[in-house]
Amino acid sequence: MAEMVLEVSDLTVRREGVSVVESVSFALAAESDTALVGPNGAGKSTLVQAILGILPHQSGQVRVLGRPLGPKGQLPASVRAQLAYLPQSFSVRNRCPLSVADFVGLGWDPPGLQLPWRGSERRRQAVRQALVKTGCSDLADRLISELSGGQTKRVLLAFCVVRPRRLLVLDEAQAGLDSQAAEQFYGLLFDLRRSEGWTILQVSHDLEMVRLTCDGVLCLNRSLRCSGPPDHALSPAQLERVYGRGYVPYHHHHR
């Protein structure tokens, strides 16, 4: 039986007494790549943040690597160190004076460490390897604030790959990228998932890219409306259930 890296059971999140996410249950097997899709306001980002313990949930349970998320979002440090989260907007970018190499090094440091430190040769070697794996070696001495959107996304993946991790959560990672940069990002993400053994949960509006790259799809509109492989979950009939009548499905393209 496949190992379940993430298990969500009957999760409900309320804001001001209103259910934003209601009774959601699913599980992610090790090394799977699952997309979370749905219309604007469906609760996708809220669900992701509740799973990570950033937002509180009112009922249900989340288990990461077999360990339950505490009532205040607590996870053992050994589990937290195996998670990585790429938010929709990277607000640190424009005010962060760190070089790319120093920023990626923060991904190596123990959770909770507040200041960058250069540490051991092992850490420096891990940073160099992460930059090579993500094609960022030539950016090592650049400031984060000097990077383009596509470069920043690659550096964020270097941050994730600098130490072994099991679960990577992305919230609209393609936001702000043109079609070429988005395709390059997803190609790199696909390669890293296979080489690093990541399990991925990604919020996405790019249904065509989801169809091409993901193993499974969760369709959310406050509650989980359908789930399954892309050919099932992204069929016109299922998309109408999630997005409403009159929704125009994406057009199929082939590489």
Where are these predicted regions, by residue range?
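Helix-to-loop junction immediately C-terminal to a conserved catalytic motif
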Residues: 52
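Conserved ABC transporter NBD signature motif
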Residues: 60-79
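Conserved ABC ATPase "signature" region
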Residues: 105, 120-139
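Conserved ABC ATPase signature
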Residues: 143-147
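Catalytic Walker B motif of ABC-type/P-loop ATPase nucleotide-binding domains
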Residues: 168-172
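H-loop/switch region of ABC-family ATPase nucleotide-binding domains
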Residues: 204-205
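H-loop (His-switch) and adjacent beta-strand-loop-beta switch element
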Residues: 217-230
